[in-house]
Regions:
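Extended alpha-helical surfaces
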Residues: 1-63, 72-220
């Protein structure tokens, strides 16, 4: 097996010059904006942003619906959307549109409601860095995880899902390459849902799984 190359990344937010002051405008922008990097940013970008993210309304659409539009019903419907359950970002984008349209069709929807603050559409651009750190064995990878930079964790555990052919993270992909002894560990890591956790919680969970399975006797 080739060594596991530890990469790091930064998620850069880029304004695209679009905003919405109410739900009708939000729907209009969603129908026009087809760049998957926009949906990606508003669902995943919060994990790397140095700011508070509402744990109940984790994606930007749900948070805006609750805090600025004051539409709790819509916010709850948007908040349960988990990007890992969709085959592609485009599928997720279409589901957001469906949720918004369904809300606007309901009898209690007020089309005149204006948000306290507009929703600003942003797109993501990932800048990748090679840390030049390498894990030669699964055990070495386990030793590296506790000090792994958050950008590295995001790149290998989350962003990898849109890069790998299998749609899995880099850690489990690499461990599966080591054969049957490491398959249970790989499967456990692949089963981690990265969306409804903070990035620090994800690192702790990854560390726990590797410690459990790579301890003496579990991978032999």
């Amino acid at each position: 097996m080739d060594p596991f190359a530890i990469m790091d990344c930064a998620l850069i937010a880029i304004a695209i010059g679009e905003k919405a002051h109410n739900l009708r405008e939000l729907l209009d922008r969603l129908l026009r904006i087809e760049d998957p990097a926009v949906t990606y940013f508003h669902f995943w970008g919060g994990l790397l942003r140095p700011q508070f993210v509402d744990p109940e309304y984790q994606n930007d659409f749900a948070a805006w619906a609750y805090h600025d539009l004051h539409d709790r019903r819509l916010a709850e419907r948007l908040s349960i959307l988990n990007p890992t359950e969709f085959k592609s970002i485009d599928d997720l984008h279409r589901r957001i549109i469906d949720v918004v349209e369904e809300r606007m069709d309901e009898d209690d929807f007020d089309p005149h409601t204006e948000a306290e603050k507009p929703f600003f559409f942003m797109r993501s651009q990932i800048v990748i860095f090679d840390t030049r750190e390498r894990a030669q064995t699964p055990e070495q990878l386990g030793d590296i995880i506790p000090s792994l930079a958050l950008g590295s964790l995001f790149y290998h555990l989350i962003d990898a899902r849109r890069r790998t052919e299998s749609g899995r993270d880099d850690f489990s992909e690499w461990l599966w390459g080591w054969g049957a002894p490491y398959a249970p560990c790989a499967a456990k890591i692949a089963a981690i849902d990265p969306y409804f956790n903070s990035i620090l919680e994800l690192r702790s969970e990854l560390e726990r799984v590797l410690k459990q399975y790579l301890s003496k006797g579990n991978a032999s």
